[in-house]
């Protein structure tokens, strides 16, 4: 939970806000977030765009309860709804309902073979003329040799588990525009972001915390896929040292792809 909240802050701030590429957020009134986790994206959108009615769905009761509590604590409950729902099954939502449907980091829970079906569901619940928006990350580039080795193990596990098309690139990020077009979206566009995190800054500290939690949490997954090296623990400790060096920096490329549903 802590890691997801940290990661959410990293992404949203680094990309300039929850909908920075959209020309006219004021025209978006009904918005759906798929796999909302602890609700960070929804709550930031609610803060910036109080006219919106926002719905977040996630398979985890724990995530949804946390998101609801956060909405209460931040006094953002008006127009905000969080529902328990499995995105890998047909969505229990009416068709043609949302002005924008958002999905971030889908590769974390979608197999490569799952993408066409889910994107079809996103298109179904989007109103004619509405937007399907997908964001995912690419391979990080850092000056920490230990961190880079850990990340390569993560890429290995994503590929072997069926979440990536290749072992060199994370997920299906480089294919998002094609997938949207093949689903039936029109006017598909993409925007690339280069999120840079530097030691001694708030972003650098958040990246360190995200990495510290993340590489602890995913170790069983790496081991199951046969991608964790025997020196993993020592490598992890070395990476945490390198991430706190004054000259540490990392670039985390992101891509947002979006398209409209035919009228």
Task: Describe the function of each predicted region.
Residues 30-34, 38-90:
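Class I SAM-dependent methyltransferase SAM/SAH-binding core
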Residues 3-30, 44, 48:
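Conserved alpha-helix/loop element of class I SAM-dependent methyltransferases that forms part
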Residues 99-114:
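A short SAM/SAH-binding and catalytic strip from SAM-dependent methyltransferases
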Residues 91-100:
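A short acidic, Gly/Pro-enriched loop at the edge of an enzyme's catalytic core
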Residues 116-128:
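A short glycine-rich, Lys/Arg-flanked "PGG" loop and its adjoining helix->strand segment in the class I
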Residues 183-186, 252-263:
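Core SAM-dependent methyltransferase catalytic element
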